[in-house]
């Protein structure tokens, strides 16, 4: 299958997202090209990955790199959101420094969104910036978190509160890796794909309503959906690299979603990121309806599609008890979009008509959350 290329152009950097099959088994050439090396003489790569990916895919990547005389330093962390922590970051940094990797060497993030955020953050601060390449292994990472240069870790006060903007040298997206992805993880990534349609591409949402099931199978429809998603995000990042304006639209569903992830202590048995975003997008639409911005009919349409894809749509779908509304509000208060203590949400005026709403009244959000919690019973 022919590879596709999406180019990300930001102020001081330009890089490619290479999308196709069997890319891990031939990664050396692309890495050499991205690092502008004529040869790999004395080049060393730190491969940051997790226990799940390492058990299935790491050997293939290492064989390809070793065959091309590239010295690798594998750094394997526990799979899951809990690895986006100071302690795990310290472990990754120490292993890279202990191996005496230099600024001109490279960190490869070989995993999902957690690994991309963690590995990218480490690369951005070690020796004030090392080369960095993303090799995303989940749908969510391939269409979202690997594109645009956001890196970081979580805090006890909330998700992604500590991090940097740090663009990679390239993104190598091997769609074959998705064939080994657990169905739940694939569905979670699909939620982020739907998000792009709900932001300002109603035709893409309608296309997904018709073709969504085909995205779950390896083939041209999946490739088409991934390419379109990457291109959409790349275009927004090119116009607003540091999220001072329209890039905030990409946070549709994330204010409520991050609130729920914090409320569930990032426990994957209860909730994973894409599921939180799915519920968060429904909540954002419901809150918009409460403000008389949209019709409840649109909410039902989105719910119908999510349910067809076996995605959660309500707080009741989250196992276990949630904190009260006041506590949830403290999590929202830590949202990165908060400016001068004023709440900012991504709200909706219609299908594919999202907008940045500033100075959203706290009382309205609190009342809304109380209503949603009461529905759980």
From Swiss-Prot:
Binds 1 divalent metal cation per subunit. Can use either Co(2+) or Zn(2+). GO terms for biological process: amino acid biosynthetic process; aromatic amino acid family biosynthetic process; chorismate biosynthetic process. It catalyses: 7-phospho-2-dehydro-3-deoxy-D-arabino-heptonate = 3-dehydroquinate + phosphate. Keywords: Amino-acid biosynthesis, Aromatic amino acid biosynthesis, Cobalt, Cytoplasm, Lyase, Metal-binding, NAD, Nucleotide-binding, Zinc. It is found in: Cytoplasm. It comes from the Bacteria. GO terms for cellular component: cytoplasm. GO terms for molecular function: 3-dehydroquinate synthase activity; metal ion binding; nucleotide binding. Pathway: Metabolic intermediate biosynthesis; chorismate biosynthesis; chorismate from D-erythrose 4-phosphate and phosphoenolpyruvate: step 2/7. InterPro entries: Dehydroquinate_synthase, DHQ_synth_AroB, DHQ_synth_fam, DHQS/DOIS_N, DHQS_C. Its main location: cytoplasm. Zn(2+) binds at residues 192, 254, 273. Catalyzes the conversion of 3-deoxy-D-arabino-heptulosonate 7-phosphate (DAHP) to dehydroquinate (DHQ). This is 3-dehydroquinate synthase.
């Amino acid at each position: 299958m022919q590879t596709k290329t999406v180019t990300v152009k930001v102020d001081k950097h330009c890089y490619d997202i290479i999308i196709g099959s069997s890319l891990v088994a031939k990664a050396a050439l692309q890495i050499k090209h991205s690092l502008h090396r004529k040869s790999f003489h004395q080049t060393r790569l730190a491969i940051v990955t997790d226990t799940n990916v390492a058990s299935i895919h790491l050997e293939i990547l290492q064989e390809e790199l070793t065959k091309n005389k590239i010295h690798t330093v594998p750094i394997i962390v526990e799979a899951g959101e809990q690895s986006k922590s100071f302690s795990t970051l310290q472990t990754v940094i120490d292993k890279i420094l202990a191996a005496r990797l230099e600024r001109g060497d490279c960190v490869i993030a070989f995993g999902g969104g957690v690994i991309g955020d963690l590995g990218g953050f480490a690369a951005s601060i070690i020796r004030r910036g090392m080369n960095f390449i993303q090799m995303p292994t989940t749908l969510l990472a391939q269409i979202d978190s690997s594109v645009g240069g956001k890196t970081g870790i979580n805090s006890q006060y909330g998700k992604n509160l500590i991090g940097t903007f740090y663009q990679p040298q390239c993104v190598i997206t091997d769609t074959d890796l998705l064939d080994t992805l657990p169905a739940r993880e694939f569905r979670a990534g699909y939620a982020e794909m739907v998000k792009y349609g709900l932001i300002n591409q109603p035709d893409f949402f309608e296309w997904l309503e018709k073709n969504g099931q085909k995205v779950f199978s390896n083939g041209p429809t999946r490739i088409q959906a991934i390419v379109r998603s990457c291109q959409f995000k790349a275009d927004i990042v090119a116009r607003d690299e540091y999220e001072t304006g329209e890039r905030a639209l990409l946070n549709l569903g994330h204010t409520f979603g991050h609130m729920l992830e914090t409320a569930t202590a990032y426990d994957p048995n209860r909730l994973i990121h894409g599921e939180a975003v799915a519920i968060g997008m429904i909540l954002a639409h419901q809150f918009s309806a409460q403000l008389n911005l949209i019709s409840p009919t649109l909410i039902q349409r989105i719910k119908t599609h999510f349910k067809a894809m076996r995605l959660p749509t309500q707080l009741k779908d989250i196992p276990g008890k949630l904190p009260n509304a006041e506590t949830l509000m403290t999590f929202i208060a830590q949202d990165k979009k908060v400016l001068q203590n004023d709440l900012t949400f991504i709200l909706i005026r219609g299908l594919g008509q999202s907008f940045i709403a500033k100075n959203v009244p706290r009382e309205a959000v609190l009342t809304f959350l109380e209503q949603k919690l009461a529905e759980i019973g």
